[in-house]
Regions:
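Basic- and aromatic-enriched surface patches that contact anionic nucleotides/nucleic acids
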Residues: 10-215, 306-309, 313
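C-terminal subdomains that position terminal phosphate/3'-OH groups for nucleotidyl transfer/ligation
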Residues: 189-196, 200-339
Length: 339
């Protein structure tokens, strides 16, 4: 069924796959036990062509199991079936699974009077259907409810290889299984990081909580002209490439009193990206001084660490003044190397 072109599994407002093999296995166990499974919701976009509004995780879990993409694990009641694929199950058990079905609720195309109304309806239904299940991240909600041109640009830019390497994310060219091992990927944090870069260019308007600030910016940015979107795409890619050329994969690592951490930090990312974007016209001079910049990035300990041990980049304080202070740290540092 899912191999046909009648079912669109990943409409733009859907989130990415998030279920691990244990959750997939428990779903299959429900079918074995004949436990009722909630219906899936479909939207008929054309005659007999359906978008999956709710039920992506269930449908892909069933599909993957039939295709032999995972074996059962951590079953609660049928533990003797652990480590078995569909083909290795007893014939009677396979037959029981084959007889089960998922009920579906279909919103017909004529429910909405226009494409815009249909898009809005689908997004609202998606939000309400997911409000009682697994909690969506802020970016997953944005992807569903604010999926305009700018959101699509953020998704595109999040595929930049060097951006992903600096964030220790699997590359888009890797297998789906590898991608789904990354929690940041599953929760669309990579896309939110791109959004942060553009939103923080307007730091003077920063308000708390940060999620609201990002929401408000995305609403406005979805109305940007195509020319503006093209310019922003170029700015992001050029900034990422410049930073990668100078720092490599360690660009966004957090400084500590004794060493540099092993994990990238949003506070460092925000500040480094803003400072380099602001100074992108001095790219040649910055590259000429790359070795010194790389080796002295966190040299000024008096600014980085206060007398009581607080770290400028520890992320405990994210009000406008703190964010601007962190950006200014790198801006001031770079000014010495652009002449």
């Amino acid at each position: 069924m899912l191999d046909s072109k009648k079912y669109i599994l990943n409409p733009e407002y859907q989130r990415r796959k998030r279920w691990d093999n244990t959750r997939k296995s428990r779903l299959i166990e429900s079918f074995i036990m004949n436990v009722p499974v909630p219906p899936i919701f479909l939207y008929e976009i054309d005659y007999s062509i359906y978008e999956v509004m709710d039920g992506l995780q269930r449908l892909t879990s069933i599909y993957d199991f039939y295709k032999g993409k995972f074996v059962l694990e951590n079953l609660e009641y049928w533990k003797e079936l652990n480590n078995r694929s569909y083909d290795n199950l007893p014939e009677q058990v396979r037959g029981g699974i084959d007889r089960r079905y998922l009920s579906s609720i279909i919103l017909l195309q004529e429910t909405a009077k226009s494409k815009e109304e249909a898009d809005y309806l689908k997004q609202i239904v998606f939000e309400r259907l997911n409000s009682g299940g697994e909690k969506l991240t802020a970016q997953e909600t944005r992807n569903a409810l604010l999926n305009g041109k700018f959101n699509k640009l953020c998704i595109k830019l999040a595929k930049n290889d060097h951006f992903r390497q600096m964030w220790q994310l699997p590359l888009e060219s890797e297998s789906e299984e590898k991608l789904l091992e990354s929690e940041r990927y599953r929760k669309m944090e990579d896309v939110e990081l791109v959004l942060r870069f553009f939103a923080y260019r307007h730091v003077d308007y920063l308000v708390s909580p940060i999620d609201r600030f990002l929401d408000d910016y995305l609403k406005q940015a979805n109305d940007y002209l195509d020319e503006t979107l093209n310019n922003l795409e170029i700015l992001f890619n050029h900034t990422v490439e410049l930073i990668y050329q100078i720092f490599g994969e360690s660009a966004f690592l957090l400084p500590t009193n004794e060493r540099v951490s092993k994990s990238p930090s949003k506070t460092v990312y925000d500040s480094v990206m803003q400072a380099f974007a602001f100074n992108i016209i001095y790219k040649d001079n910055l590259l000429k001084n790359a070795k010194f910049i790389r080796e002295n990035k966190y040299k000024d300990k008096n600014i980085l660490f206060s007398s009581d041990g607080k770290n400028l980049f520890d992320g405990r304080n994210n009000n406008r003044a703190d964010v601007k202070s962190r950006i200014e740290y790198f801006n001031s540092f770079l000014k010495h190397h652009i002449s």
